[in-house]
Amino acid sequence: MATWANLGLQDSSSPLMEQLNFFHDHTLLILTMITILVGYIMGMLSFNKFTNRFLLHGQTIEIIWTVLPAIILMFIAFPSLRLLYLMDEINTPSITLKSIGHQWYWSYEYSDFLNLEFDSYMVPTNELETNGFRLLDVDNRVVLPMNNQIRILVTATDVLHSWTVPSLGVKVDATPGRLNQLNFLINRPGLFFGQCSEICGANHSFMPIVIESIPMNYFIKWITSMTN
């Protein structure tokens, strides 16, 4: 989860988020190199006294500053397109989870099992346990098995919402009358926190998301206890 004064991204908990981290570092390196180059050129032009008295046109330099940015943009565009296609690819998911946004809570349905659905509200501060997370804990967590492909279907009943878990690299818009889907895999056990990322009204800040990732055998026991 995000911590105080954290300057970087959250620790990745899915292969998708690992790829997003790599792309972030790749792009930041290119931007740093451009900044240093432009700063050096500006400094060199500002502090030297040289003047070219025979300069009529700059065809060579114009070709360079047209072609070079195009090449740099290609180095950014190709990894970005690859990631976009990876995010849209859904291969035989093990479990389908449906998330429905409301003002101001989430409801979940496990489509592969009968009668398994519940609402998830934020735990108010005055009811929070000592070891709870303020404005992040919920009364009913989403329980999912680790190391399994999970498909999530997201929609809303009233206004626009956005189902977002940063450490998994997941952000899906919840649009009334429309089903959006995304595929992800959690590669370690733990609790993963997220929040609605689309302004949806007065209590937009108070509809958190909590995912509890557990091994498959414990997940089967949880499913059995919930359906019984």
Curated annotation (Swiss-Prot):
Which cofactors does the annotated protein need, by name? Cu cation
Q: Output one GO MF annotation.
A: copper ion binding
* Residues reported to bind Cu cation A2: 196, 198, 200, 204
- Which residues make up the binding site for Cu cation A1? 161, 196, 200, 207
GO terms under biological process: ATP synthesis coupled electron transport
NCBIfam families from the entry? CoxB
Name of the protein described by the UniProt record: Cytochrome c oxidase subunit 2
Provide the transmembrane region boundaries. Answer: 27-48, 63-82
Which residues belong to the signal peptide in this entry?
none
What assembly does the database describe for this protein? Component of the cytochrome c oxidase (complex IV, CIV), a multisubunit enzyme composed of a catalytic core of 3 subunits and several supernumerary subunits. The complex exists as a monomer or a dimer and forms supercomplexes (SCs) in the inner mitochondrial membrane with ubiquinol-cytochrome c oxidoreductase (cytochrome b-c1 complex, complex III, CIII).
- A family per Pfam: COX2_TM
Q: How does it sit in the membrane?
A: Multi-pass membrane protein
Catalyzed reaction equations: 4 Fe(II)-[cytochrome c] + O2 + 8 H(+)(in) = 4 Fe(III)-[cytochrome c] + 2 H2O + 4 H(+)(out)
Where is it localised? Mitochondrion inner membrane
* Positions in the Mitochondrial intermembrane compartment: 1-26, 83-228
Q: Which organism is it from?
A: Anopheles gambiae
